[in-house]
Design a protein with these regions (language model features):
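C-terminal outer-membrane beta-barrel translocator/porin domains of Gram-negative envelope proteins
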Residues: 1, 107, 114-232
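Gram-negative/organellar outer-membrane beta-barrel architecture
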Residues: 1-118, 123-126, 192-196, 204-209
Length: 232
């Protein structure tokens, strides 16, 4: 079992609680995760101009979002995992946010809420997950936001990620990864994707409902030494 607690203060106040149990079945192949998150912002990115994010600061709350989800994970084998998630999210903004960007939540009222259901598959054959040098990983997911209960959002997203790692001669290593997603167009501003960082463009925000990113990496091992810390 594991419990995670978070509390941050400042322009963005955030409180989070998470409980995770990877083995809830007798065969130890099923796990459960529960998450609760509350975020309150009075310094808000509300739009972009020439692909540069624009912010607004206020003494009042501009965006208050409550989200909670439950996720079931199934370990098919040592390398294959399946994840099933159900999420609820509720976002409330004030009048200033709506004046700054009418499409921020894309509803006539100052409240937007929805349910999300998703499935994710992960196949991981990497030698070391934190710093892989050999092997490959395949991750794919499909997500439906808005199940027709509240009627505020209707979005479908599919995503795929693949990476492979090679050991070359003379202690050189090469790897590549491909990431791509496609999602529904004409969505509220705050639901645009924000999970892709392209080297050299970290200060820019290019909005879109689909993309593909391909990366290459070369590495050279300069030295390799193991220290025995037990004697200390």
């Amino acid at each position: 079992d594991g419990i995670f607690l978070l509390a941050t203060f400042g322009f963005i106040k955030e409180y989070e609680f998470e409980y995770f149990n990877p083995y809830i079945t007798k065969k130890q192949k099923g796990g459960i995760q529960f998450n609760f998150n509350l975020k309150d912002q009075n310094h808000l990115e509300y739009n972009t101009i020439n692909h540069i994010p624009v912010f607004y600061k206020s003494k009042k709350s501009l965006d208050k979002t409550l989200s909670t989800h439950i996720e079931y994970s199934h370990r098919e084998s040592f390398y294959n995992y399946h994840y099933f998630k159900l999420k609820y999210q509720n976002t409330k903004i004030n009048d200033s946010t709506k004046i700054l960007n009418e499409n921020y939540i894309n509803t006539k009222k100052n409240l937007n809420q929805f349910l999300t259901i998703s499935y994710e598959f992960d196949r991981d054959f990497r030698d070391i997950k934190n710093y892989p040098l050999k092997g490959f990983r395949l991750n794919a997911s499909i997500e439906k936001t808005g199940l027709g209960i509240f009627g505020d959002v209707n979005k479908l997203k599919a995503r795929i990620y693949y990476s492979q790692y090679f050991k070359l001669k003379k202690k050189f290593y090469y790897s590549f990864n491909l990431y791509s997603y496609v999602s529904s167009n004409n969505q509220p501003y705050y639901l645009f994707e924000d999970e892709n960082n392209v080297r050299g463009y970290q200060t820019y925000l290019i909005q879109g409902h689909s993309n593909a990113i391909y990366r290459n990496t070369f590495k050279k091992e300069l030295f390799n030494r193991i220290w025995n810390l037990e004697k200390y």
